[in-house]
From Swiss-Prot:
Protein name: Na(+)-translocating NADH-quinone reductase subunit A
NCBIfam families, sorted: nqrA, PRK05352.1-2, PRK05352.1-4
Enzyme class: translocase
GO molecular function: oxidoreductase activity, acting on NAD(P)H, quinone or similar compound as acceptor
Disulfide linkage: none
HAMAP family per UniProt: NqrA
InterPro entries named among the record's database cross-references: NqrA, NQRA_2nd, NqrA_C_domain, NQRA_N
UniProt keyword list: Ion transport, NAD, Sodium, Sodium transport, Translocase, Transport, Ubiquinone
Quaternary structure and partners: Composed of six subunits; NqrA, NqrB, NqrC, NqrD, NqrE and NqrF.
Name of the coding gene: nqrA
A GO biological-process term: sodium ion transport
């Protein structure tokens, strides 16, 4: 087992009950274009078109052959675009159960599949988009070969679902998905799970299981990659989430695209935090209807540390998100708040009484408690960064855009989520995720 000591389990109130309930009926789903780094869509549908589940909606011009398929049948209700015509979302009004059928295989045939057959079925169904590269966190090219594939079967994000609960309901599909991935490449398939977690595996020669323990970010793919198979400019691995492995197993067993999702609905503003069944790209406001405390709330698709605000054209469950988090907007000002002992406020430093209340869960809000200021290196980054890098120096280079030094310090190993804790504990109120993305784009473009 690999156990990390540095990190932070955020003591946030509203942790979900680890029992799966049926979610509300969903009448709108969408694909969010801005989730896919560097993607430029070539649209295959227009507003008003009827689509089947699994039908191609658009293709990536910059990554030919990579297609994005409909998570449900219905009609294209809207195609939202932002500045410079950036695709924000393709919205489908759900109607009927029409769907496209893909290749299916008998259980005993899965172990004999060729890599070409696996690749073709994943690409045609749109499940190829479940894979992401590291470095750069982009969808791999259809003819690319990874050095390894990392299956993330654990989640240490605040308010997250326990993967063991989700996988237990679909253990056979998870095993089939692992077997299919083992046929996609001859390289290693690293299945990463929490210490002692009951996660099934397969006996394929290239599948290895690893256990991780410790605080967040022990459950992030970036942490797993760093300790097992570090990447670089000339070494690429792929990552995939456990729920997508289940979807792959069902696709190859039934020939039908499975877009079901189990999401954790949690946070201090949720009346009954719990796990809910829904669908990929579901309208978040429909999931949360009647579930929230009547207040000025911020609804987030994903983790409170690294999720996206779910509203307007983005009011949909993200492709790579397995949770919906709800906290209160922090709009009120507090007069001389820094003078008070503040037992109801949490800080990683010893500046509030709440820091010393080890078993207390706090009602966090969106306030950053201060304005923008210079970066202040007082050791907070090192306390939450378990990777063997120099976080203060790396973060400084991200701020100034020094791509050469950032690359030398290990930025190619990282994704936005890997720096979310650094943003949370930053006295200077910097958001390091967008800064990292900007540097990665420059490195990819200029070398």
């Amino acid at each position: 087992m690999i156990k990390i000591k540095k990190g932070l389990n955020l003591p946030i109130a509203g942790r979900p009950e680890q029992v799966i309930y049926d979610g509300p009926a969903i009448t709108e789903v969408a694909l969010l274009g801005e989730e896919y780094a560097g993607m430029r869509p070539s649209m295959k549908v227009k507003e008003g078109d009827a689509v089947k589940k699994g039908q191609v909606l658009f293709e990536d011009k910059k990554n030919p052959g990579v297609v994005f398929t409909a998570p449900a049948s219905g009609k294209i209700a809207a195609i939202h675009r932002g500045e410079k015509r950036v695709l924000q979302s393709v919205v489908i009004a759900v109607e009927g159960n029409d769907e496209i059928e893909f290749d299916r295989y008998a259980p005993d045939a899965l172990a004999k599949l060729s890599g070409k057959e696996v690749r073709r079925n994943l690409i045609q169904s749109g499940l190829w988009t479940a894979l992401r590269t590291r470095p750069f966190s982009k969808i791999p090219a259809v003819d690319a070969e990874p050095f390894a594939i990392f299956v993330n079967a654990m989640d240490t994000n605040p308010l997250a679902a326990d993967p063991v609960v989700v996988i237990k309901e679909a253990a056979e599909d998870f095993r089939r998905g692992l077997l299919v991935l083992s046929r996609l490449t001859e390289r290693k398939i690293h299945v990463c799970k929490a210490a002692g977690a009951d996660v099934p595996s397969e006996n394929a020669a290239n599948i290895e299981t690893h256990e991780f323990g410790g605080p967040h970010p022990a459950g992030l793919s970036g942490t797993h990659i760093h300790f097992i198979e570090p990447v670089g400019a000339n070494k690429t691995v792929w990552t995939i989430n456990y729920q997508d492995v289940i979807a792959i197993g069902r696709l190859f067993a039934t020939g039908r695209l499975n877009t079901g999702r189990v999401v954790a609905l949690g946070g201090s503003q949720v009346n009954k935090p719990r796990l809910l069944r829904t669908v990929l790209g579901a309208k978040v406001s429909q999931i949360t209807a009647g579930e929230l405390v009547d207040a000025d709330n911020r609804v987030i698709s994903g983790s409170v540390l690294n999720g996206a605000i779910a509203q307007g054209a983005h009011d949909y469950l993200g492709r790579y998100h397995n949770q919906i988090s709800v906290i209160e907007e922090g709009r009120s000002k507090e007069l001389l708040g820094w003078v008070a002992p503040q037992p109801d406020k949490y800080s990683i430093t010893r500046t509030t009484l709440g820091h010393f209340l080890k078993n207390k869960l706090f009602k966090f809000n969106t306030a950053v408690n201060g304005g923008d200021r210079a970066m202040v290196p007082i050791g907070t980054y090192e306390r939450v960064m378990p990777l063997d890098i120099l976080p203060t120096l790396l973060l400084r280079d991200l701020i100034v855009g020094d791509t050469d030094s950032a690359q030398a310090l290990g930025c190619l190993e990282l994704d936005e989520e890997d720096l979310a804790l650094c943003s949370f504990v930053c006295p200077g109120k910097y958001e390091y995720g967008p800064l990292l993305r900007k540097v990665l784009e420059t490195i990819e473009k200029e070398g």
